[in-house]
Amino acid sequence: MDTVSAFKLEVRADKIAVITIDAPGEKMNTLKAEFGNQVRGLIRQVRDDKSVRGVVFISAKTDNFIAGADINMIARCRSAQEAEALARQGQQIMAEIHGLSIPVIAAIHGACLGGGLELALACHGRICSDDEKTRLGLPEVQLGLLPGSGGTQRLPRLIGVSTALDMMLTGRQLRARQALKAGLVDEVVPQAILLQAAVELALKGRPASRDMPVRERVLAGPLGRHLLFHFVGKQTQRKTQGNYPAVKRILQVVENGLAHGCSSGYAEEARAFGELAMTPQSQALRSIFFASTDLKKDRGAEAEPGPLTSIAVLGGGLMGGGIAYVTACKGGLPVRIKDIQPRGINHALKYSWDLLNKQVRQRRLRPSERDRQMAMISGATDYQGFAHRDVVIEAVFEDLALKQRMVSEVEQYCGPQTIFASNTSSLPIGDIAAQARRPGRVIGLHFFSPVEKMPLVEVIPHKGTDPQAIATVVQLAKRQGKTPIVVADKAGFYVNRILAPYINEAMRLLVEGEPVEEIDKALVKFGFPVGPIQLLDEVGIDTGTKIIPVLESAFGERFSSPANIIDAILKDDRKGRKNNRGFYLYETKGRKSKKRPDPAVYPLLGIDRPQSRLSAQQVAERCVMMMLNEAARCFDEQIIRSARDGDIGAVFGIGFPPFLGGPFRYMDTIGAGEVAAILQRLAAQYGPRFTPCDTLLRMAEQGTTFWPADERLT
């Protein structure tokens, strides 16, 4: 049976060949291996028809040009040689497109990423729509890879090496106007005339080569290139701690091509692509990609979600303001904020205004669009306008009686269909619902701070929550741009429960005399974005430690903080960055706030002279092993539904190193037996809190894993 082609050729009356990209049965266009022959066949037809004056590539999809290559192709490769051959095939197809003697133009609307941008780079000209959906980028580094179809060679020659490196090393995506300014596209036009404009560009002949700015010409020369790559190499090493081999290989491949020419660069690119595809880091990063993609299809319960037409938020504080913003500005849903004080409503409105206005200043948003989005948020000090709200998200103080009163009031002023979603971080949802008339409509929806930045939410049904309420809240979280995981209604839920022992162990290391900055450096070296002590400062020491007594009450001694360390810090009015006094001191210089460890912390904790006695590896081992042990307990107690959810929760919720794939994939990689052995060694050295849980001991004995065997390979 023949595969339905994703590429359709039509020659217009003006002799411009339009190749329409439309992957059959797929929402997104992605490049698959079998498309290679289809493209080659069309290129051959164009080449053989001497009357054709130009070619335009355009997508039939409503919101994407080509979103990248199909990652499953890489997962199916069983050796570096197979992956290298895949890259060479991509390079050859792009070379055939670029080799056409007539103008080839890419007409881009929507996502143009990875292999999609590499195809556009192989064209002689690029024109894109001015739509907000239009994004151009090479995000392969986020999968532990590099662009493998010529992108490492074509992009630096088109826009300059420094801008190209920034895009490839970070995966940063450019909007239409940014792409125009960078020289990545030749024109930006309204979507309605995109095809017409691309045809006109093709009829003009090949676009002239862009004059590179003087700075980029200098950086492309031998001396400038040497200085640039030396500087960027040091900078990326500091940021990645050597944990992401793709970063180093991108630098090597780009430099090789600039120094020795395109042919050498293409060969090195394909070889590096093959090597990187087989690294454990890429396999782990791809597993996160597959897991998060899988979660997008997960409804959370065996039920259809209810309607989502309007939402309400109780509380205009930091969390309430952030929740209102993502609901209205990301989710496109009208929001009504209720606060007992007008200043609370004003605070929440200002929160959204400031975020939107920042986008206007950065020219990412038009003032008219800012005003339209702000008009979707309203406020009141009473329940006016609440009657028909589908979901009411509660973001008031962590006080059980107060939250129960909120449930009662919402049931009084809202319809029977309204779902009450509590943004609690510590209180059992079953307790909040205990006095409800409609307990089936009560659920937990735990956001992380700052709401607009943190991608994860925990959805927490209690035993009596309706399946439809679960599905509706999961759908709402997705509308808000979040990745939701459904977790059980037990103390700490999942993320805070695995985070607390990690933080507590860092505090114990501090009490033992390890310097604040050395503890943080050790965990950053391990792969966390920030260390545990800095994390406490960022979240707020008062906020971040509220959960610990709750966990200690529920699970006992293993959650107790050492020697009242937190009490001593809080009594000295140290709340972290929010009052510029925590374990670090913060000085505002220019736009950025610089931090330095505060030596006054040590006497507060009874520490005479802090001194590093342990290696970075030993410090990291103690903190991380406490987290892994607790994660295994959560798995056994079915706090999470699967290893997939546990890995996504840890990576998206607390920054567990993505290149390790999450705590469960990491434990599977090193083996339950090895994890248990390390914990037993630490227990002998430091005490019973490190005793491996029964789950790990059982898995070690049976040789089993958290992830099913067939899912561990992706």
From Swiss-Prot:
In the N-terminal section; belongs to the enoyl-CoA hydratase/isomerase family. The record marks E118, E140 as: Important for catalytic activity. Residues 1-190 are annotated as: Enoyl-CoA hydratase. One of its GO terms (molecular function) is 3-hydroxybutyryl-CoA epimerase activity. Pfam families: 3HCDH (PF00725), 3HCDH_N (PF02737), ECH_1 (PF00378). Residues 306-714 are annotated as: 3-hydroxyacyl-CoA dehydrogenase. Pathway: Lipid metabolism; fatty acid beta-oxidation. Its main location: cytoplasm. It comes from Klebsiella pneumoniae (strain 342). GO terms for biological process: fatty acid beta-oxidation. This is Fatty acid oxidation complex subunit alpha. CDD domains: crotonase-like. It catalyses: a (3S)-3-hydroxyacyl-CoA = a (2E)-enoyl-CoA + H2O; a 4-saturated-(3S)-3-hydroxyacyl-CoA = a (3E)-enoyl-CoA + H2O; a (3S)-3-hydroxyacyl-CoA + NAD(+) = a 3-oxoacyl-CoA + NADH + H(+); (3S)-3-hydroxybutanoyl-CoA = (3R)-3-hydroxybutanoyl-CoA.
